[in-house]
Amino acid sequence: MLPAEYDIAGKIVFITGAGRGIGKGIAQVLAEAGADIAINALTPRYVESTAAEIADATGRRIIPVIADVTKTDGVQHAVDTVMQAFDRIDVLVNNLGDAIRRPLVALPGKADAAAALSDDELKFVMDVNLTEAILCTRAVGPHMLERRSGKVINISSWTAGQGGGEMVVYTIAKTALVGFTRAQALEWASYGVQVNAIAPGIFPDPVTAGEERARQTSERAARIVPLGRAGQLREVGLLALYLASAASDYMTGQTIFLDGGMSL
């Protein structure tokens, strides 16, 4: 039996970008641990099927929240939906993220060089990896501060520790998310709200990338990750369980690299 501090039964969790991938993995574990969850995505077919799948498997109340959380009105709609359904938010997981593998500036002398990021692509990468977390934290924060209780978990990336080839803007956003985590944690520390981050390494998802690409990613991870394998989506959920529970009450402002040793 786990210590009581790990018990999150009855907690209300809001997870962005949770229709698939890491967000879905987090939702599955937290629901298994007894939490009721609002999972957000912009694509109805992913978020609705994921909500139904997790609800059927765990018996918990899982609701889909379809909204663009990179925009203020979308965030407000999402938070209003969660508050109407559950009356509170105990844990916010800012998981939304995406990368475009292109350089900031086209690299000369490379026959296969990718084109530089366009203005629209640059804005997209910053919005989904950083702006979303800021907007959602701003919207949920007043509810947590009023109750003097809450957990915010930001999902960063291993690239925040050492950069990522042809992913400069993505790295900028994920590194800024680490700074945001530290600054917001300090500002809210005296109000009983903890803010921490997880920086995942390589976690292939066949649903997101397709079976073949996920297999290739796993093979690459076996070569370059010190622990010799890619991560499993569930493993991010297990760490999120710790950060969502009272077991982590004395931790705030920290970023935990869950990357099989890639950041060493």
Feature locations, PLM:
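C-terminal substrate-recognition "lid" of short-chain dehydrogenase/reductases
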Residues: I15, S149, R229-L258, S263
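Conserved mid-core segment of classical short-chain dehydrogenase/reductases
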Residues: Q76, Q84, A99-K123, E146, ...
